[in-house]
Amino acid sequence: MAHKKAGGSSRNGRDSEGRRLGVKKFGNEAVIAGNIIVRQRGTRWHPGTNVGIGRDHTLFALTDGRVQFATKQGRAYVTVVPAQDAPAREAAE
């Protein structure tokens, strides 16, 4: 005879994995066309100049350049300043 009652199994102990959302390229960072700048759910950040938006609201660079974040009328925008317009930081270093 068993001297202890069999323990029940827990039905907890699992969680979904994180979705790896957020800003991937920050302000003044260099990007090339096609680079993902922001992965998001919904439009927390809106696409500005030279930035495209994917079906899942991912923002990506349409041209080579540098990332800029700006707020206009309560909306956050992400733009890419083309490489020839941006100050050449690499040349100075």
Curated annotation (Swiss-Prot):
Annotated GO MF terms: structural constituent of ribosome
Entry's Gene Ontology cellular component terms: cytosolic large ribosomal subunit
Domain of life according to the entry: Bacteria
Coiled-coil blocks: none
Region feature Disordered, mapped onto this chain: 1-22
Keyword annotations: Ribonucleoprotein, Ribosomal protein
Entry annotated with the keyword Transport: no
Alphabetical GO biological process terms: translation
Keyword Ribonucleoprotein part of the UniProt annotation: yes
Family recorded in the similarity comment: Belongs to the bacterial ribosomal protein bL27 family.
Protein's UniProt name: Large ribosomal subunit protein bL27
